[in-house]
């Protein structure tokens, strides 16, 4: 039932399961590059576009209608942070100085800025993922992660595949299946989260190095 799972909350409060939610120091906001007048993409549609700036970044992914969904990942507070961007003048100055080749692609930048929410990012860790043979959490309820490795949904699908295999292996003995599932999948959930945080550093910082390409 998702990253803010009620089932997990009940497991933690009733059975004293380990639980940690780590909200990272960066928030994000989505913006949109519209299509060109002829309906075509203004940037290469077959590329992942990243503007790496060390501690923060902007990225853009192509949509089928000629637009690009863009996401700014920036610190909550401090230099180059969301807390500094509270007026039209501040937002336009920020993008003009930090992303000068981007601002011209979004003519309604400030109206988008005001309309789209600034949202947080975090990682969920809990252990175990089951209560005997009565209940089990999978997907984001068990291992919600940040999006920088692009494998969160795949990890959830993998949960389903492994769970089906274990149900067969244990002849649908839920208690035995759930216990093994929790032990087998927990390290994988942690691993995807660690890789996601590592890749955030790579994307926002390391991709600026010509040697990376």
Report each predicted region and the residues it spans.
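Conserved FAD-binding catalytic core of PHBH/FMO-like flavoproteins
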Residues: 1-121, 125-131
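Conserved phosphate-binding and hydrolysis motifs of nucleotide-dependent enzymes
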Residues: 2, 139, 152
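Hydrophobic/aromatic residues within well-ordered alpha-helical segments
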Residues: 64, 95, 159, 185-188
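Short, histidine-centered active-site or binding-site loop motifs used for metal coordination
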Residues: 74-76, 141-142, 196
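Short FAD-binding loop at a beta-strand-to-alpha-helix junction that anchors the flavin cofactor
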Residues: 130-147
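Hydrophobic, well-ordered secondary-structure elements that form the walls
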Residues: 140, 160, 181
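A conserved FAD-binding loop/helix module that cradles the flavin
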Residues: 147-158
């Amino acid at each position: 039932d998702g990253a803010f799972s009620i089932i997990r909350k009940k497991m933690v409060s009733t059975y004293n399961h380990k639980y940690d939610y780590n909200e990272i120091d960066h928030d994000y906001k989505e913006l949109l590059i519209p299509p060109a007048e002829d309906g075509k993409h203004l940037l290469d549609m077959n590329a992942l576009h990243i503007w790496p700036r060390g501690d923060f970044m902007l990225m853009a992914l192509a949509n089928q209608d000629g637009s690009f969904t863009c996401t700014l990942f920036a610190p909550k507070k401090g230099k180059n942070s969301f807390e500094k961007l509270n007026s039209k003048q501040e937002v336009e100055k920020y993008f003009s100085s930090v992303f000068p080749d981007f601002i011209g692609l979004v003519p309604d930048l400030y109206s988008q800025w005001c309309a789209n929410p600034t949202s947080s990012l975090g990682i969920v860790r809990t252990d175990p993922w089951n209560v005997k043979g009565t209940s089990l959490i999978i997907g984001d309820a068990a291992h919600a992660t940040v999006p920088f490795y692009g494998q969160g949904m795949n990890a959830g699908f993998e949960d389903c595949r492994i769970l089906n295999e274990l149900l067969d292996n244990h002849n649908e003995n839920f208690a035995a299946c759930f216990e093994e599932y929790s032990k087998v999948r927990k390290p994988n959930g942690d691993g995807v989260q660690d890789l996601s945080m590592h890749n955030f550093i790579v994307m926002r910082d390391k991709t600026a190095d010509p040697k990376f390409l």
